């Protein structure tokens, strides 16, 4: 950059420092989101991907991917707390359309509809909402096997009667035939707090270093401007 009077000031350093701080801020945000999601059921860790062009593109050179490893399994006394012990997602339907989730904390309404905690309908492997033809007095009368077949006890026949298979799909929406469903379990996040904090430290140091560089370069620019003012 050429300043009036013929004095030149290199602005690339300031721009590079600002861009680097923006990138570091985004990386810190991703890590903070993972730390916040540590104790959330069904949360999957986000991983920031830094491209080789990030130095020039800034935050536009960043992207995130989802770590689809299975999280921590914890036993639940609720028969409608269901988890997937493999990769995959439950399919649900709301007014906003079809969504996928790893959060298998379900409930039953008075009509026998299988719902998520936010009242979305849980879909079967045929893409239809699951509805029990018998609403049991005790949720323990509902059984779900490892292939996702939901059955309910019929007190009249004293037998379990199949209702539907839970619709479990992969990241591309393709149906998974052997999803390894576990009834009476909650899957907490696959986040490792130790790994998140370890990865956070160099990013914070890099942010602080770029902030110091920016302040130094900004002070130098102010001196140049001040000298120009004195010269005139």
Task: List the model feature ranges, each with a label.
Residues 1-232:
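Amphipathic alpha-helical polymerization modules
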